[in-house]
């Protein structure tokens, strides 16, 4: 009886988790909004609403803002015009909270998650071929003592360096050609680089 109850609870948890995943259409719109929001952090500089500005923070912020309702109040507070925007997403209340409930490990969830935990507990491995990446996917590097994420935008990557000054907001955009020919080979995304772990996709997105 006890084992049967545990199995039922696990099954229900899986059903709930699956129901919160975005379908193919929602995932496409999520990517479009995610990329657009990330681009604005590059164009305008990091939003005052974006706390903990680093590489993982960019992903957390863009995902959280993507899942919100993008009404006129949101557009104004984020410095967006109403032109050239993706279609709005229809989401359940649970789906809108996905970026507030990251798996932090040890059975805990919350709005904050580190780069390594974002990859380990909240993403799925896609491969090491950059041609497999879709807009919004993450390119993950592990340097041993530190991990780093870049966001694939379709033709280039953007990322936050993890530090900023009065004259440098920390945001960077790098073309694929530049990335593949960097002198510092630790950051080249190919399978000959032991520091390049691979391309990862948020696990609530449809593959």
Describe each model-derived feature in a short phrase.
Residues 1-4:
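Positively charged n-region of N-terminal signal peptides that target proteins for export
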Residues 9-19:
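Hydrophobic h-region of N-terminal signal peptides that target proteins for export
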Residues 57-61, 149-152, 157-160, 173, ...:
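Active-site scaffold segments
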Residues 160-163, 170-207:
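Low-complexity, Gly/Ser/Thr/Pro-rich intrinsically disordered linker/tail segments
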Residues 6, 11, 30, 51-54, ...:
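Residues at the start of alpha-helices and the adjacent loop-to-helix junctions
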Residues 81-167:
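...with weaker cross-activation on analogous glycine-rich loops/strands in unrelated enzymes
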Residues 17-112:
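N-terminal capping segments
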């Amino acid at each position: 009886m006890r084992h049967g109850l545990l199995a039922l609870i696990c099954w229900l948890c899986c059903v709930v988790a699956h129901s919160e995943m975005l379908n193919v259409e929602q995932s496409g719109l999520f990517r479009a909004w995610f990329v657009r929001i990330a681009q604005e952090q590059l164009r305008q500089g990091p939003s005052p609403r974006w706390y903990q500005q680093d590489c993982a923070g960019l992903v957390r912020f863009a995902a959280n803002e993507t899942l919100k309702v993008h009404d006129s109040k949101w557009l104004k507070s984020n410095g967006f015009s109403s032109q050239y925007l993706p279609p709005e997403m229809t989401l359940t209340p649970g789906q809108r909270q996905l970026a507030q409930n990251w798996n932090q490990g040890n059975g805990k969830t919350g709005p904050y998650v580190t780069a390594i935990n974002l990859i380990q507990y909240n993403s799925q491995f896609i491969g090491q071929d950059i041609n497999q990446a879709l807009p919004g996917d993450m390119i993950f590097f592990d340097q041993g003592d530190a991990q780093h994420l870049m966001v694939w935008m379709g033709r280039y990557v953007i990322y936050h360096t993890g530090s900023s000054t009065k004259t440098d907001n920390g945001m960077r955009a790098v073309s694929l050609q530049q990335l593949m020919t960097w002198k510092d080979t630790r950051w080249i995304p190919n399978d000959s680089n032991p520091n390049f772990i691979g391309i990862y996709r948020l696990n609530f997105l449809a593959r």
